[in-house]
C-alpha cells in the first residue's frame, strides 16, 4: 500500500511538472506576442506623432501671422492635400491590427476648430475694412458738402467795388459764418465714427493675438505629447482644446464688457457735446441777428452818404466837362459823334450801380438769413423729435413696468382670495358639523320630553 501511494505521489508530481512547463511555454509565447504587438503599436504611434507634428508645424507657419491670414485665403489645393493626408492615414491605420479611429476623429475636430478660428479672424478683418471704408466715404461726403457751401458763399458774395468796400466785407463775414456751423457738426460726426471704429479694430487685434496664442499653445502641447501613449495624447488634446475655448470665451466676454462701457461713455460725452453745441449755436444766432441789424443800418447810412456825394461830384464835374468839350471842338478838323462813356456813362452808371448793388446785397442777406433759419428749424425739429422719441420710450418702459406691477399685484390678490376661500370652506365644514350635532341634540330632547310625558300620564292613571 505504501508503494502504491508513493507511486501515485510521483505521478502527481510529474503531471504538475508537465503543467508547469506548459504554463511556462504559454507565458513565453504570450510575452513574445505582446512584445510584437507593442512594437507595432509603438511604430504606428511614432508615425502618427510625426505626421501630427508636421501638420501642426505647417498650420503654425501658415496661420501664425495675421498678414498671412489676410493675404493667403484657403485654397482648394490645401483642402485637397489635407483630405489626401487624412485618407492616407486612415488607410494605413485600417491595414494594421490596431484601430486608431478615435485619434483621427480628434484630429478632425481639432482641424475644424482651427478652421473656425481662421474664419472668425477673417470676419473681424472684413468688418474692420468695412468700417474704414464707411469712415472714408463720410469724409468724402463732408468735403463735398464743404465745397458746395463755399461755392454758394462765393456766389452770394457781391462783386468788389471802391464805393461799397465796407458793405461787401460785412456781407462776406456774415455769409462765411454758416459753413462753420456745418463743419463743426460734420467733424463731430467723423470723430464719433472714428471712435466707434477704433474699439472694433482693437478688439479684432486682440482676438487675433488670443487666437495666435491658442495655436502656439496647441502646437507646443502636441510637440511635448509625442513622448506619451495614445491615451495621454487624447486627454491632453481634449484638455488643451477646452482650456483654449475657455480662455477665448473669457477674453471675448471681457472685450464685450469693455466695448459696452466705452460705448456708454461715448454716448454720454456726445450728449453733453450736443447740449453745449445747442447753447453755443443759439448764442451765435442771437449775436448774428443783432450784428446784421446793426450792419444793415450802417449800410443804409453809408449808401445815403455815398449817393449825396456822387450827386455833388456830378454837379461839379458837368461845367468842367462842357468847357473841355467846347475847347476840344475847334481843334478837331473832323466832327465825330460824342462818345457814350465820355458824356453819359459816369453819372448814369453810378446811380444804377448803387441801386443794383443795394438790391444784390439785400437779396444776399435775405438768402443767408433764410439758410440760417432753415438750419435752425431743422436742428430744432430734430432735437424735438429725439426728445419726443426718448419720452415715448420712457413712457413705454413706465407703462410696461406699471402693467407688470399691476399683474403681480393682481396675482398676489388672487392668491390671497383663494386662501381666504379655503379658510371659509373649512369654517363652513365646522358650522355644518355643529348644525348636525344641534339636530341630534334636539331629537334627543324631543324623545326625552315624550318619555317624561308618558311617565306623567302613567303616574296620573295610577
From Swiss-Prot:
GO terms for cellular component: BORC complex. The keyword DNA-binding does not apply. One of its GO terms (biological process) is lysosome localization. Residues 1-108, 188-208 are annotated as: Disordered. This is Uncharacterized protein DDB_G0284127. Residues 119-150 form a coiled coil. Keywords: Coiled coil. The lineage of its organism: Eukaryota, Amoebozoa, Evosea, Eumycetozoa, Dictyostelia. Signal peptide: none annotated. The keyword Coiled coil applies. Residues 64-95, 190-208 have a biased composition (Low complexity). Residues 36-51 have a biased composition (Basic and acidic residues).
Amino acid at each position: 500500500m505504501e508503494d502504491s501511494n508513493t507511486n501515485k505521489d510521483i505521478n502527481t508530481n510529474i503531471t504538475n511538472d508537465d503543467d508547469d512547463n506548459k504554463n511556462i511555454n504559454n507565458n513565453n509565447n504570450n510575452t513574445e506576442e505582446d512584445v510584437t504587438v507593442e512594437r507595432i503599436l509603438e511604430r504606428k504611434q511614432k508615425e502618427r506623432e510625426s505626421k501630427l507634428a508636421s501638420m501642426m508645424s505647417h498650420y503654425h507657419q501658415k496661420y501664425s501671422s495675421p498678414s498671412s491670414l489676410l493675404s493667403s485665403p484657403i485654397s482648394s489645393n490645401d483642402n485637397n492635400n489635407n483630405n489626401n493626408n487624412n485618407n492616407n492615414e486612415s488607410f494605413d491605420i485600417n491595414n494594421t491590427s490596431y484601430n486608431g479611429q478615435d485619434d483621427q476623429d480628434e484630429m478632425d475636430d481639432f482641424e475644424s476648430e482651427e478652421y473656425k478660428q481662421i474664419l472668425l479672424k477673417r470676419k473681424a478683418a472684413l468688418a474692420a475694412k468695412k468700417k474704414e471704408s464707411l469712415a472714408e466715404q463720410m469724409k468724402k461726403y463732408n468735403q463735398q458738402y464743404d465745397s458746395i457751401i463755399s461755392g454758394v458763399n462765393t456766389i452770394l458774395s457781391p462783386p468788389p467795388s471802391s464805393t461799397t468796400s465796407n458793405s461787401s466785407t460785412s456781407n462776406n463775414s456774415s455769409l462765411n459764418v454758416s459753413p462753420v456751423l456745418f463743419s463743426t457738426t460734420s467733424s463731430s460726426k467723423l470723430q464719433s465714427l472714428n471712435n466707434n471704429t477704433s474699439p472694433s479694430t482693437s478688439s479684432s487685434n486682440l482676438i487675433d493675438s488670443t487666437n495666435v496664442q491658442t495655436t502656439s499653445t496647441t502646437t507646443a502641447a502636441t510637440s511635448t505629447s509625442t513622448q506619451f501613449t495614445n491615451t495621454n495624447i487624447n486627454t491632453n488634446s481634449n484638455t488643451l482644446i477646452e482650456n483654449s475655448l475657455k480662455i477665448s470665451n473669457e477674453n471675448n466676454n471681457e472685450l464685450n464688457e469693455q466695448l459696452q462701457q466705452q460705448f456708454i461713455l461715448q454716448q454720454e460725452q456726445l450728449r453733453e457735446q450736443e447740449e453745449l453745441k445747442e447753447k453755443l449755436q443759439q448764442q451765435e444766432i442771437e449775436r448774428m441777428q443783432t450784428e446784421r441789424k446793426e450792419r444793415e443800418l450802417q449800410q443804409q447810412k453809408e449808401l445815403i452818404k455815398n449817393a449825396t456825394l456822387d450827386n455833388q461830384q456830378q454837379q461839379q464835374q458837368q461845367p468842367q466837362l462842357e468847357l473841355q468839350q467846347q475847347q476840344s471842338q475847334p481843334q478837331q478838323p473832323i466832327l465825330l459823334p460824342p462818345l457814350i462813356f465820355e458824356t453819359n456813362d459816369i453819372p448814369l452808371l453810378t446811380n444804377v450801380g448803387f441801386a443794383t448793388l443795394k438790391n444784390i446785397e439785400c437779396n444776399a442777406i435775405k438768402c443767408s438769413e433764410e439758410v440760417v433759419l432753415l438750419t435752425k428749424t431743422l436742428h430744432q425739429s430734430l432735437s424735438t423729435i429725439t426728445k419726443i422719441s426718448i419720452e415715448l420710450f420712457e413712457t413705454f418702459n413706465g407703462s410696461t413696468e406699471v402693467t407688470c406691477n399691476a399683474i403681480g399685484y393682481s396675482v398676489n390678490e388672487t392668491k390671497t382670495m383663494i386662501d381666504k376661500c379655503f379658510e371659509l370652506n373649512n369654517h363652513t365644514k365646522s358650522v355644518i358639523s355643529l348644525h348636525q350635532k344641534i339636530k341630534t341634540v334636539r331629537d334627543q330632547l324631543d324623545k326625552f320630553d315624550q318619555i317624561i310625558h308618558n311617565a306623567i300620564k302613567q303616574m296620573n292613571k295610577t
